Amino acid sequence: MHKAGFVNIVGNPNVGKSTLMNQLVGERISIATFKAQTTRHRIMGIVNTDDMQIVFSDTPGVLKPNYKMQEYMLAFSESALADADILLYVTDVVEDPEKNADFLEKVRTMTIPVILVINKIDASNQKTVGQLVEKWHALLPNAEILPISAANKFGVDMLLKRIQELLPDSPPYFDKDQLTDKPAKFFVSEIIREKILLYYDKEIPYSVEVRVEQFKESAKQIHINAVIYVERESQKGIIIGHQGMALKKVSTEARKTLEKFFDKKVYLETFVKVDKDWRSSQKELSSFGYNPE
């Protein structure tokens, strides 16, 4: 009998959901940085064996939205509650267990298997982790609780084994050679945005979106033109930097990562444009792929 199912990863910002997703899939599907709200979309990563298919979904961190883009991000997270066969609720050793009580209540009332993953235990001690397990058991009495360190791969194999045990009997949902539901252009824009998150401070990374205007692939190389959108002229100047040096650094680092990702020579051109309404315009957000169902 073949097993298959949707395993959706939810939780608050910056608890390590994307790192865990990448470890479970065994590939770099989601960008992961030390900054909150790195993930903006719902991203699927697919694990296949002869008799099993696990469709993991990484989701944006749960937050109270301040503008339309964040409303869409929350909708991605809430949609993950609706179509999961197994839910992974990820927290860490410093998070307040009662943060975002409304979302947590939705998790508590779910009838599917829920695994509460306490991440980053390498940054704590056995006593503190034990106390957290007790607190979480009181909040989510029906959930299985598994402490892990995704960054160090501690406990990840045990988590994967438990997921395999809980998977329902089902034919595969995707072709067995498919790794994700996202096209190549999506990963290009995400990798460029990752470098912006790493190299710029304050509001700049959160005011930026990337659109790939051209993606031409041949047997040995890829030519990419990408536009970085910001909200204000002042942000455009910061992104470009003195004599274009800041943008050149981001583009160089993005190109290196893209060459590893695609295993090909990459030629990357980046441009910066101002679109002051992109975070609040439904039309603009839709063009950037913010289409929660």
Per-region residue spans from a language model:
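Conserved glycine(s) of the Walker
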Residues: G16, G155, A246
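Catalytic P-loop NTPase motifs of RecA-like helicase/translocase cores
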Residues: T39, V62-K64, D96-P97, S124-N125, ...
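Active-site glycine-centered loops adjacent to acidic/histidine catalytic or metal-binding residues
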Residues: D58, N119, S149
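Conserved C-terminal guanine-recognition region of P-loop GTPase G domains, centered on the G4
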Residues: A75-A143, K216-S218
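Canonical P-loop GTPase G-domain recognition
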Residues: P113, D122-T180
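P-loop NTP-binding site
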Residues: A184-E293
